[in-house]
Amino acid sequence: MTCGTRSSFSLVHWLEAPVLGISSLPLPPSLSSDTSAHPPLSLSLLILEISSARPFLFRHIIDTPTLPASPLPPPPTPLHSCKNCKRFSPIILYSLPPVLLMAATFVPAHTAFFGAKKEIGARSSFSPSISAHRCRKHALNKVLAVMAPTQPSRAPATTGSVKHGMTMTEKILAKSSDRSKLEPGENIWVNIDVLMTHDVCGPGTIGIFKKEFGKNAKVWDREKIVIIPDHYIFTSDERANRNVDIIRDFALEQNIKYFYDIKDLSNFKVNPDYKGVCHVALAQEGHCRPGEVLLGTDSHTCNAGAFGQFATGIGNTDAGFVMGTGKLLLKVPPTMRFVLDGEMPHYLLAKDLILQIIGEITVAGATYKSMEFVGSTVESLNMEERMTLCNMVVEAGGKNGVVPPDETTFKYLEGKTSLNYEPVYSDESAKFISEYRFDVSKLEPVVAKPHSPDNRALARECKDVKIDRVYIGSCTGGKTEDFMAAAKVFLASGKKVKVPTFLVPATQKVWMDLYSLPVPGSGGKTCSQIFEEAGCDTPASPSCGACLGGPRDTYARMNEPMVCVSTTNRNFPGRMGHKEGQIYLASPYTAAASALTGYVTDPREFL
């Protein structure tokens, strides 16, 4: 049996085989160079594999033996004599039935995708054209390489060799891994610039860190860890409050420089260190910088990609490892390119654009891929609108989203950070797995109907949907510009809302902006004044609020079946509370217009 054998055996079936065991995994340079400088560790690695036939997540936690303080033992005998597989000999497999092991031998190893360019206008729909080419290499090579990446030997360039460019994401990861060249699918040890965690995942991350590195271990860099309580804050729930206590104790113990604490829950304004929603606070406090790698224990960490950096969410196990080493094993994602051109209509916002995109490619369309946003429309967006674009790439399955940094980016960062940063941009010869083009001038306001962000519909097509409430807030739709947009609709209508309208600023700064910044064209009125005249609820304490449900006493939580138009990012059953609640995701324009009528409403009725 050779590695060149073809078979139709499904990779998905193979991935459903029992857990794989590993012996002798390679370590990050900082650990492997001098094992005597570190105590023995027990690592847990997350293995991700994507099926070529369809988006498919293969995730196993594999515990390795304690790392020896002496040189690693010699590699075991290779599984077979295939020359293509010998380089992975440090790995052995067990607990794999012989039948599956034999079947796996037939599995194609690599897949190259070719996505046709798409021209997209109003109301267009399509299924991305993807064709798969199956390689002849041994299937085990692919999986083994994911588990134990090796540095391939590179021969000197020969006459006539072609230098291929890299995408933004590839360049950032190359720089952070001290590599001159990277390609999608490679597994690399990345040096992390910023690690963020919050009150929901922080306690778990801290627990794993202490278990694996020792109760008295110190974090790798106290100035590169940001801890932000924001999710379950203004509640009497004891478990939620205990989580905040845990991250506070850890921050004090480790002398974490950037811990944005809140102690008095009765009045957030007396807590000068408290910020609010982590993703918006990271930007406002200068932790988002072009060309860097930012990881967070929250899926919407991709929000920071608006600054031209690699930002993605990770689990507690990975975060615990990063806390102790400052490194993480990452697989380089391929990049999808989204070109948005045309003048932005006055009735559209970035939320309409990202809902349009997700509706086109589906919630699985960008699975473990980078989404790069370019074009004249993107260049015209302010930083908060760019953050909205990148925030929801994870709703399409994306690994990360990026916007090329420009003068708008640099101006936003002035006064927010004193650290130097190095912007990077995609090469002209960079390879993209697919490209989608949108003529933004032809698009209309859209919503995502229950119960999925890709269940897209034109807002005007949902005019008969009666609603019970409107919610304006979250990391996606609770920024200053989002409230300015809502106030613009209320001001233009001169009417009062017909359903309860809840306002939850993302951060303290946003809250203060609502009471201090005049709304353009209002004659000096602030958002808070316009909201009061329209009959909205008083702006609440800044936090994640009801975006993710939370304890029963969370402000604006849906504790009974209701229909809600929301500027948040997810609408699966139970997301904002009651499992029978229905959530229509929309832009602040559409949310405000709907509040005025009591039905899902196209904002062009008022703008």
Language-model segments: what does each one mean?
Residues 2-4, 63, 84-607:
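Fe-S-dependent hydro-lyases/dehydratases of central metabolism
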Residues 8-99:
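Low-complexity proline/serine/threonine-rich segments in eukaryotic and viral proteins
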